[in-house]
Amino acid sequence: RVVAPSKLAGNALVVQETLDQVLSIRKAWRFNRGERRVRRLPMLAYDSLQPDTSGMATADVVDMYNGAPDRYQWALLGKREMLMPYNSYALHQKGIPYTDILQEKHVNPALLRHELHRVWVVEATLRTGFSHPYAKRRFYIDEDSWQILAVDLYNKNGELSGLQEAHSINYYDVPMFMSTLETIYDLKGGRYFVDGLDNNEPMYDFNVQLKKSDFTAAALRREGI
């Protein structure tokens, strides 16, 4: 559920994932606060746009990459040491005003931390016959956690047009290594989108008990009322 900004607050989404998204695509429903109704989304995968992102984020950039891998040709380019976003505890601090985090062209660099880490470099090239804003993607995957830390995004002309970063921390009490904030930059348009701002929100409840019925259109409808 979207909690901010106010013009989007109340919109919500529920997704049912499948184990093999090549054979069976995910199902998704969206509650629109303005219409006060739930609609089935015909497609929330590949290059379809995420709702409420002003066209900044395709469906498959959530969690740095998600969904079926079949539209790309994949290649392992090897391992290298690179400066990567890591241990982003300053960015995760409670009570920081979001206006201090989000600057005009980028996230406030004073709150970011980058460290030298060994990463696996994986390149994905769009297969012939398919379309996507990102004709090539280069993933930098943490050797220790297997978290995707950064992604270079190239357009059909081979130009670097975008960048994703996962600013991650250890949730020691779980335990789990996960991003506290994900960013995607449109280098051509001079815009960026962030996902995961929680400095002024309640902390995740990793022990919540969920039921299958919580992930249905009916549950989404009840949530939106």
Predicted regions: what they are:
Residues P202-I225:
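Compact functional segments
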Residues R1-K7, L13-P69, V107, R113-L210:
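Gly/Pro-enriched, hydrophobic low-complexity segments
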Residues P69-A135, A217-I225:
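Mature hydrolase/peptidase catalytic cores and their serpin-fold inhibitory cores, especially
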